[in-house]
Structure formats: structure tokens, C-alpha cells
């Protein structure tokens, strides 16, 4: 019930931000998925600055960067003269956000969306906040339909055990436990988290990875590049003895697409589902 109330409040906040016909003209977006959503809704030309996590699309990556989303400076944001700041809930520090609001700039905070329902609520909320409510509703509906079509194509039963690695190669690999975006995507794709007993992201010993016995290992393209490629990752202690390593079942995805629960949610889910269920007949996805 509390989660549902939070989602309803989120939508109400964005809906009440601007009077009809007064869409913002200078927007600062803080958070990769938020930025991507604004661009997907056709308002990229109004974005004047972003944070370091906003790497897609290319036009967003070319805009002025305001630092890391949790370590912002109010002066940098205000120097861009925004009339709206769209930010994830973890944007901060709180003093910087308060200073931006005190300067008369509207700030909309958007909760992290680790699941389909909150992701669609966030897309609609972004659309309402930037004066594109109809476009936001249409995009959310399209993504919801695409995810439903993917789910319909998944084979029943036999969920593969999936280990998601957020980092590897420097110390013990960091794996995704429960309550993470990675676990939510694994579940949507018809898989089972191999380390579901963990909470959030935790370092795993070699023994723990062997005990997890994943059928598939999933990571990000940045992590795979950082460790030196597929062969090196699969040869890491603990990983090398897993069923996934033995079968060579390793897949890497763009981090924002896979974990951001933004406009590319269905596209990323489609790719993950194909990895987990090679024989499944899945629909063709639109690229965003």
C-alpha cells in the first residue's frame, strides 16, 4: 500500500508542477534514465545540462555536465538558468537541492524505478512535468505492451540461474542481490537470481560464486571491458568453475539500458530474454 501511495504521489507532483500551456523551456536533468526519457519524449532541445550518468543519447552526452548526481553544486546548476530541474530521488546533497529551490527553480524528484510499474509511472510523470503528458502516456503504454509481449513468449518453467556482476577484476566481484534493478530485470526475463539471498550489491568470494552455480553470467559492457574481455572474466577464481563458465554463457549489456528502467527497457529486456532462453520465439522490438 505504501509503495502504491508513493507512485500516486509521484505522478501528482509532476502533474501539478506547471500550469497548462507553460511547458518548461530550460531543463536540467539529473539521472541517466530521466535524461533519456526527456529526449525520448521529444524535449531534448530544451535540456541545457545533465549529470555524469546521462550518457545516452549522444546529444545528451554532449551537453554541459554538472558532476555526479549525488555530489552536485547548486551554483553550477543555477548558472544554466533552468526553469525546471528533473532529478532522481538520490540527487544531492540536500543542501544543494534546497539552494536550487530557494532560487525559485522548480525541482521534481523522481524515485528510482526498479520494476515495470514504477518505471511506467516515472515515464508518465516526466511527460507531465515537461508539458508532454500525452507523449509520456503513449510511451509508457507502448513499453508496457512490449514487455507483455516478451513475457508471453517466454517458455514456462525452468528459470535459469543468473549471476549479475556489477564489477569484477579489482578485488572480489560485486554481485546483485535482492532489491536491485538487476534482479528485477532477471525476473522479468524469466530468470532466477543465483544469489537471491543477498541484499543489494555485495562482494562475493570465489567459494560463494561456486556455490551460486549460475547457468548464465550477465554484466555490463563497461565491466567486461575493464576486466579485459570475456576470456579473462570467465577465468576469474570462482567464476571459472561455474556452469556458466563451462558453457561460455556470458552476456554484457549497456548499463543504463539494462538497469535504468527507462525508454529502452523493453529493448534491453528482449536482449536479456534471448540470452536466458535461446530457443524462445520473441517479438521484434522497436529501437529507441
What are the functions of these language-model segments?
Residues 75-81, 205-213:
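Short helices/loops that flank or line small-molecule/ion binding pockets
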Residues 31, 89-90, 112, 166, ...:
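Short secondary-structure boundary segments
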Residues 93-102, 216-234:
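A ligand-binding cleft/hinge motif common to bilobed small-molecule-binding domains
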Residues 6-22:
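N-terminal export signals
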Residues 1, 18-30:
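C-terminal segment of N-terminal export signals and the immediately downstream linker at the start
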Residues 26, 84, 95-172, 193-197, ...:
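Extracytoplasmic substrate-binding proteins
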Residues 176-201, 221:
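His/Asp/Glu-enriched short active-site or ligand-binding loop at hydrolase and phosphoryl-transfer sites
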Residues 26-80, 84-96, 230, 239:
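A short, structured surface patch at a secondary-structure boundary
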